[in-house]
């Protein structure tokens, strides 16, 4: 276990309350609740309002569920298969600017997708759901097996579910089931430039 989380400056409580556990209950996720999470992601800011994100998902019990589980790295399959939904976040490398007809490249798609994921995660938390982002995905297979258009990039996987008891996990994963802490502000925010060594 770690020490309790606390903010050094006043912020909205959901920023420190949200975390990424791996144990889920068997509760199912309705299409309406999932769409509320996508609605939050929809309103994320992006460079030139290009909105380069695309979410492809399956809910547990659907015909596509086993395929979506298999697109995770084996380590993540072991616990994420119990989630209520699995979502893959993909980015598109181009967008059509306002007033234009031809696609233009964007070099900030991954950055914008990260913001959209953050909005989704916070919305899920506000609704009592867990959204756990995962880098351990079969990125190449996601592109081909989910039929993504040319140029798309698989960014992350997201497991969504209700928080379950830690006993649902293996002993190895139980040891990792705690709220992680964060670096202090002075380690990453510098006025006027980087500090001299």
What does each of the following model-derived ranges do?
Residues 1-197:
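Acidic, surface-exposed loops and disordered segments
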């Amino acid at each position: 276990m770690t020490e309790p989380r606390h903010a050094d400056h006043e912020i909205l409580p959901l920023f420190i309350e949200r975390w990424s556990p791996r144990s889920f209950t068997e509760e199912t996720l309705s299409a309406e609740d999932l769409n509320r999470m996508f609605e939050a992601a929809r309103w994320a800011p992006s460079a030139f309002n290009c909105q380069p994100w695309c979410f492809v998902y399956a809910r547990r019990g659907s015909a596509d569920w086993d395929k979506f589980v298999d697109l995770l790295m084996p380590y993540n399959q072991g616990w994420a298969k119990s989630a209520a939904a699995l979502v893959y976040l993909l980015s598109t490398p181009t967008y059509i600017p306002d007033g234009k007809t031809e696609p233009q490249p964007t070099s900030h798609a991954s950055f914008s997708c990260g913001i959209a994921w953050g909005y989704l995660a916070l919305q899920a938390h506000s609704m009592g759901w867990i959204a756990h982002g995962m880098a351990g995905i079969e990125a190449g297979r996601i592109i081909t097996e989910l039929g993504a258009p040319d140029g798309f990039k698989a960014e992350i996987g997201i497991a969504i579910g209700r928080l379950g008891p830690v006993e649902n996990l293996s002993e190895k994963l139980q040891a990792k089931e705690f709220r992680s802490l964060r670096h202090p502000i002075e380690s990453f925010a510098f006025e006027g430039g980087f500090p001299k060594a």
